[in-house]
Swiss-Prot record:
It is found in: Cytoplasm. Gene3D superfamilies: 3.40.1280.10, tRNA(m1g37)methyltransferase, domain 2. Homodimer. The keyword Oxidoreductase does not apply. PANTHER family: TRNA (GUANINE-N(1)-)-METHYLTRANSFERASE (PTHR46417:SF1). Transmembrane segments: none annotated. GO terms for molecular function: tRNA (guanine(37)-N1)-methyltransferase activity. This is tRNA (guanine-N(1)-)-methyltransferase. Belongs to the RNA methyltransferase TrmD family. It comes from Streptomyces coelicolor (strain ATCC BAA-471 / A3(2) / M145). Specifically methylates guanosine-37 in various tRNAs. Keywords: Cytoplasm, Methyltransferase, S-adenosyl-L-methionine, Transferase, tRNA processing.
Length: 277
């Protein structure tokens, strides 16, 4: 996979040289190219922004440097046979970045990131390149950052760890929170390691039992427990058919039951009356 990042702060992307992403780069599994947007400015101040049409506070990033930068990146990528590119635009007004989307992006051969600053990039840039390639406008949360570089780091790590051979154990992400399949709408439960005793706190007996079926059931129950406590919205929009008998028994213990009035894309589960906190 090839990743290109166009930014006015190339140094912000230094963390891509360390940890799993850095190792993937060293092994040739991931090619990362960071470009300084100001290399495509032609005035003595290296201007990348201007005042917004219609008035209002803040500045807007200009079309010309972004257009020239993206054209240059695309030309280089096409010349080296990178496959079909996709543009990833970090923005608080984008679609939520989810594990499902991370999996989808990990299957693409080439991603180009456009982290913005100020009030964002002139909309015409996104509209222009949407005629040439798929565009993903993504948000990493319901908050606003000073720029999109932090979001690039988040998305890159989420995507890179899904590439074949990047994780030491190919099964490591199977039980992740939000992983496609059985964990699609659940948070991962707690994990433990040695020593077996620490400051008077032990390990749940089931994890020491060697009984794989019981361990799997305990982990599933703990995932349900954590999800209902921390992200009840995930349970509310689940289809009860996605849960087996044991799941439903655990959800009942935790104060949840099927909603007989649930509609598709609505709330499928609700707290049992009288058990709300």
């Amino acid at each position: 996979m090839r990743l290109d990042v166009v930014t006015i702060f190339p140094e912000y992307l230094e963390p891509l040289n360390v940890s799993l992403v850095g190792k993937a780069r060293a092994r040739g599994q991931l090619g990362v190219h960071v470009h300084d947007l100001r290399d495509w400015t032609y005035d003595r101040h290296n201007t990348v922004d201007d005042t917004p049409y219609g008035g209002g506070p803040g500045m807007v990033m200009k079309t010309e440097p972004w257009g020239d930068a993206l054209d240059s990146v695309l030309a280089d990528g096409y010349e080296t046979g990178c496959g079909e590119p996709a543009l990833v635009v970090p923005t608080p007004s984008g679609r939520p970045f989810t594990q499902e989307l991370a999996v989808h992006l990990s299957e693409r051969p080439w991603l180009i990131f456009t982290p913005a600053r100020y009030e964002g990039i002139d909309r015409r840039v996104v509209d222009e390149y949407a005629t040439r390639m798929p565009v993903y406008e993504v948000s990493i949360g319901d908050y606003v950052l000073a720029g999109g570089e932090a979001a690039v780091l988040v998305v890159t790590e989420a995507v890179a760890r899904l590439l074949p051979g990047v994780l030491g154990n190919a099964e490591s992400h199977r039980d992740d929170s939000f992983a496609p399949g059985a964990m699609a709408n659940l948070l991962e439960g707690p994990v433990h390691t040695k020593p077996p005793q620490w400051r008077g706190r032990g390990i749940p007996d089931v994890l020491l039992s060697g009984h794989h079926g019981k361990i799997a059931r305990w982990r599933r129950d703990e995932a349900l427990r954590r999800t209902t406590a921390n992200r009840p919205d995930l349970i509310e929009r689940c289809d009860p058919a996605a849960f087996d008998k044991k799941d439903r028994e655990m959800l009942s213990i935790l104060g949840w039951q099927p909603d007989p009035d649930g509609e598709p894309y609505g709330r499928f589960w609700r707290r049992t009356p009288g058990m709300e906190e």
